[in-house]
Amino acid sequence: MAQIDGLPPLREVIAAHKLSAKKSLGQNFLLDLNLTARIARVPGDLSGADVLEVGPGPGGLTRGLLAEGARKVLAIEKDARCLPALQQIAAAYPGRLEVIEGDALEVDATAYLSPPIHIAANLPYNVGTELLVRWLTPPDWPPFWRTLTLMFQREVAERIVAKPGSKAYGRLAILAQWRAEAEIALTLPPQAFIPAPKVHSAVVHLRARTEPRYPADAAVLSRVVATAFNQRRKMLRASLKGLTPGIEDHLAAVGIDPTRRAETLSLEEFCALARQIAAG
C-alpha cells in the first residue's frame, strides 16, 4: 500500500512522529498494511459511502479504507500526537479524510457524515464496549450505520457472536444479534501489534438489520439484559428482582420459568420479556 498511496510504511511514520502506544488510551498500533487492507475489505464495497473510524492512531486502517474507495473517512482521534500523521494522509487524499481531535463518546459523528455510513475501527480497548452498546441501541430502525467492522480482544469478539447456554453469552450477544447479523471475520495474533498485547484480537463484522428479529424497545431490552446478566448465576426471579415490581408475574406472563438463569434465555425470550415489562 505504501506504493499505492505514496505514503511511507507505518514503522517510518511512527518513528518520524515519535509515536508510542499509550496504555492509558488503550492503544495498540497495527503496523502491517496488508492486514489493515484486509480489514478495510471486510465491510464490502465502500465506494460512494462514508466511514467513521474511531481511534485511527497513525492511520494504517485509515489508509486501507481510503484505498478501498471510501467517499469520505471521518477519523476521531483523542491523542493529539497522532494528528500530524493523519494530516499527512489527508494531504494524499484531498477532500476525503476529515480528522477530529476528541473523544468518540462525545462527538456526534452523524453531523459530519452522509448515508450510507459504515463504521470501522481498531477500537481502543478501554472504550470499545461502551461505544458498541451505544451503536447497537439507537431507537431507530435501521440504525444510521450499515455495517460495523470492529477489532476487539478475541474474548470480547466471542461474546458478541455467542449462543445461549455458553459462558460467553450475555448482553453483547443479545444486543448485537438483535440489531445485526454478527460474525468474526478474522483473528489477529499479538505479534501483529506494537506493543504486542497479551491476548489475540479479532475483527467482528456486523451487518445492520432493517428491522428487529423480534420487536422490543431498545432501551428497555438493554436494561433487562444488563440487569439479568449482572448476576448471571442467580435465578431470574432474584437477578431481575430490582428491575421492576412484580417481576415473577411478568415472567409468568411470557411463559418463562423464574428459576431459570439468564444464560439459558433466547433472544426471542428476552424480547418478549422486554415487551411485557414495557407494557407494564
Curated annotation (Swiss-Prot):
**Enzyme kind, highest EC tier:** transferase
Q: Where in the cell is it found?
A: Cytoplasm
Q: Does the keyword Kinase apply?
A: no
Instruction: Spell out the reaction equation it catalyses.
Output: adenosine(1518)/adenosine(1519) in 16S rRNA + 4 S-adenosyl-L-methionine = N(6)-dimethyladenosine(1518)/N(6)-dimethyladenosine(1519) in 16S rRNA + 4 S-adenosyl-L-homocysteine + 4 H(+)
Any GO molecular function: 16S rRNA (adenine(1518)-N(6)/adenine(1519)-N(6))-dimethyltransferase activity
Q: Which Gene3D superfamilies match?
A: Ribosomal RNA adenine dimethylase-like, domain 2, Vaccinia Virus protein VP39
Q: What is this protein called?
A: Ribosomal RNA small subunit methyltransferase A
Q: Which organism is it from?
A: Dinoroseobacter shibae (strain DSM 16493 / NCIMB 14021 / DFL 12)
Q: Which gene encodes it?
A: rsmA
